[in-house]
């Protein structure tokens, strides 16, 4: 039995860079601030600059931070600037030390469980059928991912409804409704097949706003690693008026013979087409989350660090949200996206193309701040309140997300109104206005609200989006989700292991395209290490996002009360999500699997991985 040696090296690599000068690790219950490094005390009460009796000391602190916490070039692609400078580097090392401390028990479990999983499939005689992939999961991974894979994910992996509904749940950031007034049908599909599948024509679906596109054709520009293969799929989906379901219509590979597959093809051909799409989608989800959550939240916060005193209440809130944030990209650069590293070991495309994706998508799709507000993004893609097509029967991402973000908005609204009794007070806050100017200036935040900021509503929107990015959006694509849903084998491999077919028909066995026993366990174990099961017992879940003494004690009774209400709301949402069951049609939220990826009682409040 070959050991999973790729797991063992990560701790050594990260520890080499994650040593604090004093050897200590900051407790997760504190609001980490740079004040420990600048020599200024952590505040016990937050004040606005216009109300501070020692304004000069605030100015000195900010000047020191601006001198010692600087912008340096982006890492892992050309996205946002990273944190540097003498103090900035120490912040990164401190956060890496805490991050590796949290990783270590998960990594140890994953190493042990991975070897047990590999032995189990080898004792079985290897992977001989698609059903054998279940052996890799059954009875394993309870330490690293206690909840296991999502109920229904494996038993229904051939389901077209499952494949389609994943576009509205486990990776909801790609699909969009085609607008008959501004879009074109991206590729043709055999007319007889369309009629058979939909009861109507492709043009009628398009003109009625019932046709949807998920497009990964840009990946045709990428070159797969030796022995790895990938298509660059586009997939069409439609609203079926007969069943009331959101279903797949066709998948186009955009490579080689550029075949177009439909559900009417031979079952193995069609299942392979869905697998090929998922290879593209899996790559997208993992790198999109990096450019959309990490890169965006980091740079907005870095601008705040350089302009807000540690006594500023907004600074205190941001530092809670950004717990451990600067550990992730720095660690990923050396241990995940390094040449031959963990990413290269599993995915079809190397780290070179991960960086290219981040570089290409950050300025256009992933990085714009206001355009990615929760509902704004869904509306822009025609998934919510579309005027040019029928309502989706189910949109699980929004069904859960709108409840969570409304609770976040309520807390943030109280926080902002407590800090600023009027828009006038906000307008007169010199540090806050400097932050907005810095974000639009040296920090180069894309699509950030312009300076000056005039209303409390605008600030509440900014802070709500920051909380959404760090505590919710990130975990839809990362954290435990790839293990439980979006990376479950055999439907979701990180790479193909045989060339994309040049013709349809004649496929008797899909195993040549799928990872073997060793590569399968490597993929599963990598995803297991993304999870953080200890956060529940450590009170680091979304439910506890604002529940930290230093923040609440320094901002007043109204904010404390708002946190209590927030925790009650999160508890209610968590109970609803965690107790989901299938209905009498075998569905949950219109899907043949139970999705719990946004459970506030399980996901972290921060950018965990």
Swiss-Prot record:
Residues 117-609 form the Lipoxygenase domain. Glycans are attached at residues 24, 115, 156, 193, 385, 539. Three His residues, the carboxyl oxygen of the C-terminal Ile or Val residue, and a fifth residue, usually Asn, ligate the metal, which binds water to form a catalytic base Mn(2+)OH(2) for hydrogen abstraction. Gene3D superfamilies: 3.10.450.60, Lipoxygenase-1, Domain 5. Its cofactor is Mn(2+). The keyword Oxidoreductase applies. Mn(2+) binds at residues 289, 294, 474, 478, 609. It comes from the Eukaryota. GO terms for molecular function: linoleate 11-lipoxygenase activity; linoleate 9S-lipoxygenase activity; metal ion binding. Its EC number is 1.13.11.-, 1.13.11.45, 1.13.11.58. One of its GO terms (cellular component) is extracellular region. Transmembrane segments: none annotated. Coiled coil: none annotated. It holds the Pfam family Lipoxygenase. N- and O-glycosylated. It is found in: Secreted. InterPro entries: LipOase, LipOase_C, LipOase_C_sf. The keyword Secreted applies. Keywords: Dioxygenase, Glycoprotein, Manganese, Metal-binding, Oxidoreductase, Secreted, Signal. Lipoxygenase that metabolizes linoleic and alpha-linolenic acids to 9-, 11- and 13-hydroperoxy fatty acids. Oxidizes linoleic acid to mainly 9S- and 13R-HPODE and alpha-linolenic acid to 11R-HPOTrE. Belongs to the lipoxygenase family. Manganese lipoxygenase subfamily. PANTHER family: LIPOXYGENASE. This is Manganese lipoxygenase. It comes from Colletotrichum gloeosporioides (strain Cg-14).
